[in-house]
A protein has these predicted regions:
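Short, compositionally biased low-complexity segments
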Residues: 52-79, 83-84, 96-112, 314-315, ...
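Short, glycine- and charge-enriched coil/turn segments that flank and shape catalytic ligand pockets
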Residues: 26-32, 346-351, 419
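Hydrophobic pocket-lining residues within nucleotide cofactor-binding pockets
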Residues: 42, 176-177, 470
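Hydrophobic alpha-helical and helix-loop surface patches within well-folded domains
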Residues: 37, 85-105, 110-407
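Generic structural hydrophobic/aromatic packing signal, biased to beta-strands
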Residues: 6-8, 16, 37, 50, ...
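Long, ordered, helix-rich scaffold segments
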Residues: 293, 299, 316, 328-333, ...
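Extended, low-hydrophobicity, Ser/Thr/Pro/Gly-biased non-transmembrane segments
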Residues: 1-85, 227
Length: 535
């Protein structure tokens, strides 16, 4: 654990952002500017980040000011206010916000948004109005914000993930600005959740990364539903749809990854052990492919989903807040969370739940957790999923009729208007289910794109569209595929694999052209993984 301070010189006109408590104002000396930052809260040195570049601050124009809520308007929507009592802290001494009544009452902390000038207007429209509501939603659930301020920075297409959180700074890929506000809101909520789980509370053993990523994945749904002010029933429906999508993704991950990489607690009872020299070993830490895996996100999410089902969401979220109050500023192990959970809900022991059972069924084993199998039927019967299944049936019938009769008649717009409009996550599921259909006519793909305006949807939806384009060798939309590989590099790695596996000469030429064009700007890990796929 460490604190830090830094004085950074950079070319005049550039911007320096850092993991720092203060909003640094530069001083100038000729062609250079100097920026000074500091942190007083001890954190793992690995959380330190610095960004230097030519970005502009995104501020609300007059037409947007009405969309930026005031602290008072946000606080009125929060039904779970922080307790006025001050928790006792278990960490080393530092100026802790959890001991500060003013910090406790802050629904959202001061924030700034930065982006390349070319994305300023898009960030102003999509991202800026979401920051305060998402911060407030997080406060409603977990209480005191661990950090006094936050900068949100839009990073280039070559960034290796959709987002990353560090103390006082959140990095978001430009991909989150695609579509409307759904993907941006969800990812922003995920990174905000890391302020509590991943930063204020960290994993004592780095192999237990589910403590960070699984928790943030679980909380992103809760925060986003709160930020949207959804009813309890609407939030439940969204959660069921997301659970089904994550279950399908987890199945794919398990089928296409090594078993060793699927274990959430790979060191088991030896977790957090230190050698005589003081060193610890992080299993698979140098595996470049691991950073593109989502097992720890997904499986970790389902661990928490399982525990939530045992006690109910309201009680589970109250427990989360208690856990944060006790363990903020500390490094933890899985057993710390589970021990406090079993201590809080001791009646579960009589129902057969124990820490050992969670280890055996969830944390210490590869593959799909057996307790999950009972939940899948419930998810598929939810209203939002049934709507998608009905639309899939319509599209399959549309394709069959087209194959039989399209040579004699043209499809009219009346063939399309009967299709229902879908939410972004519903569109993702629709395209995934259509991907499982053996064949779809070119005309069906054409109308599918037109009806849902797939080129204007967010990157998650467009990724599934690209998978359909690859599978059916729909050459008309190869431009969509090239655009995706260039503009959404963190997500494009999966498409490179599918393009090569398809063994189509034209598609493989496309892969090589894109890689040659992009390789110099690619993230090194991504470049290595893609190069191994195609050469």
């Amino acid at each position: 654990m460490a604190t830090w301070q830094a004085s950074v010189w950079a070319p005049k006109g550039s911007l320096v952002l850092m993991s720092g408590e203060n909003c640094a104002e530069p001083s100038h000396n000729g062609a250079l500017s100097n920026w000074s930052y500091y942190v007083t809260m001890p954190m793992p040195a690995s959380t330190f980040t610095i960004a230097v570049g030519y970005w502009v601050e995104v501020k609300p124009e007059c037409t947007f000011r009405s969309q930026i809520p005031s602290p008072s308007s946000l606080s009125s929507t929060c039904t779970n206010k922080s307790s006025v009592s001050l928790p006792s802290c278990g960490h080393s001494a530092y100026p802790c916000r959890f001991q500060n009544p003013i910090a406790q009452a802050q629904d959202w902390i001061p924030y700034r948004v930065f982006a390349p000038d070319c994305l300023k207007l898009r960030s102003q429209e999509i991202l800026l109005p979401l920051v305060a509501p998402c911060l407030s939603a997080a406060h409603c659930v977990l209480g005191t914000h661990p950090f006094s301020r936050v900068d949100v920075l839009i990073v280039p297409a070559s960034f290796s993930s959709l987002g990353m959180a560090s103390p006082h700074i959140i990095f978001l890929s430009q991909s989150v600005l695609s579509g409307r506000k759904h993907l941006c809101g969800v990812r922003l909520c995920h990174e905000i959740a890391h302020a509590w789980f991943g930063l204020a509370i960290g994993a004592r053993d780095w192999t237990e990364e589910w403590i960070s990523e699984g928790f943030a994945t679980y909380l992103e749904d809760v925060f986003w539903a709160n930020a949207q002010k959804l009813s309890e029933e609407a939030a439940k429906e969204q959660h069921q749809l997301k659970s089904l999508l994550r279950w399908r993704r987890l199945q794919d991950e398990v089928q296409n990854s090594e078993e060793e990489l699927q274990v959430l607690r790979p060191n088991k009872e030896n977790t957090s052990e230190v050698s005589d020299s003081g060193a610890t070993i992080v299993k698979h830490g140098l595996n470049p492919g691991k950073i593109f895996m989502q097992v720890h996100y997904l499986k970790g999410y389902f661990v928490l989903h399982y525990l939530e089902n045992e006690v109910g969401q309201k009680q589970f979220l109250k427990f989360f807040r208690l856990f944060v109050e006790r363990f903020h500023g500390q490094l933890i192990l899985s057993q710390d969370f589970l021990h406090m959970f079993m201590e809080k809900f001791s009646e579960l022991r009589s129902q057969g739940l124990s820490m050992e059972a969670v280890y055996q069924n969830w944390l210490d084993v590869a593959g799909l957790p057996k307790p999950l199998l009972d939940d899948t039927l419930k998810w598929t019967e939810s209203r939002l999923v049934r709507e998608v299944q009905d639309e899939v049936t319509k599209w399959v019938e549309f394709s069959k009729k087209d194959r039989k009769g399209s040579r004699k008649r043209k499809c009219s717009r009346k063939d399309v208007v009967t299709f229902k409009e879908l939410l972004p996550d519903q569109l993702v599921l629709l395209l995934e289910l259509l991907f499982a259909v053996k064949s779809l006519s070119s005309r069906t793909l054409q109308w599918l794109q037109k009806h849902y305006c797939l080129r204007e949807q967010d990157a998650e939806v467009r990724h599934r569209w690209c998978e359909l384009v690859i599978k059916h060798k729909y050459t008309v939309a190869y431009g969509d595929l090239i655009n995706f590989l260039e503009q959404h590099q963190a997500m494009g790695v999966y498409l490179y694999g599918e393009l090569m596996v398809n063994e189509d000469a034209r598609q493989q030429q496309l892969v090589h052209r894109c890689f040659i064009k992009l390789q110099e700007e690619m993230d090194p890990s991504l470049q290595k993984v893609v190069a191994e796929m195609i050469f």
